[in-house]
Design a protein with these regions (language model features):
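A short beta-strand motif characteristic of beta-propeller blades
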Residues: 1, 27-35, 66-73, 110-116, ...
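N-terminal "mature head" segments of proteins
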Residues: 1-56
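Repeated scaffold domains used in trafficking and secretory/extracellular systems
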Residues: 2-8, 37-48, 76-87, 119-129, ...
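Hydrophobic beta-strand positions that form the internal "hydrophobic ladder"
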Residues: 13, 50, 88-90, 131-135, ...
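Short, solvent-exposed loop/turn segments at conserved positions within beta-propeller repeat blades
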Residues: 15-16, 53-56, 94-99, 142-148
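Hydrophobic/aromatic beta-strand positions that recur at structurally equivalent sites within the blades
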Residues: 16, 24-25, 53, 61-63, ...
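Loop/turn residues immediately N-terminal
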Residues: 18-22, 56-59, 67, 96-101, ...
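Extracytoplasmic/luminal low-complexity segments enriched in Pro/Gly and acidic/polar residues
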Residues: 141-213
């Protein structure tokens, strides 16, 4: 079967194909398999857990190497998803009410947070190690010019937006939490030479601000 994605899975490797998720050990021996019937499958992995989802239908299944931990449906098509250290999972959804929506579930698959983004697509998500916040990359277009926003949301606050920085003429494509107070955003600057693949920007932030290190 065609391999759509391959990623480390604890000390093993998880392969996503058009009809299954296969976990192989270091000797390439199959140690787990989950069959799926998703028409447009994708997956997010954190250490020994895999979140397999259908981008079209919104169906998802959470598994480890020995069993299925749970499943559900987001109610909307999925752009992308992420998993956190404490079992938190987050989806970027395509909804009728907004351009995109962040939907967050706890380890019991109970919905704990939602945030609508009116103008931009939530392109990438990283959940903080403590499970209390998420860093997002939003991508939009204004007057035929692409821009990105780096947004940090706190799940517990009435006003969840902790940080919101806009980058004109820039495509941010990957965001990663270094720690609970530090994130790394990877970008491609359209003004730079095409040969340069991209550059990395590190940020550390306190309770309310995000500052370039």
């Amino acid at each position: 079967a065609d391999v759509l994605d391959m990623t480390p899975f604890k000390s093993n490797i998880a392969l996503l194909t058009r009809d299954s998720v296969v976990v192989l050990n270091s000797s390439a021996k199959e140690v787990a398999r989950l069959e799926h019937n998703y028409s447009d499958p994708d997956m997010a992995v954190y250490k020994g857990r895999a979140l397999v989802y259908d981008r079209t239908s919104g169906d998802f299944t959470l598994m480890n190497s020995s069993k299925i931990l749970g499943d559900g449906n987001t109610g909307s098509p999925i752009y992308t998803a992420a998993m956190g250290k404490d079992g938190t999972i987050a989806f970027s959804l395509k909804t009728s009410a907004a351009q995109s929506e962040l939907c967050v579930y706890n380890h019991k698959l109970e919905k704990i947070f939602a945030w609508e983004c009116a103008q931009e697509k939530i392109f990438d998500i990283s959940i903080a190690p403590n499970g209390k916040s998420a860093a997002l990359i939003l991508v939009g277009s204004e007057n035929a010019v692409t821009y990105s926003r780096l947004v940090v949301l706190s799940f517990k606050k009435d006003n969840p937006v902790v940080t919101d920085i806009k980058y004109d003429n820039t495509l941010l494509f990957d965001v990663i939490y270094n720690s609970s107070t530090s994130i790394i955003a990877y970008s491609t600057d359209f003004k730079k030479k095409k040969k340069k693949k991209g550059h990395k920007e590190d940020y550390s932030f306190g309770s309310n601000t995000l500052a370039h290190e």
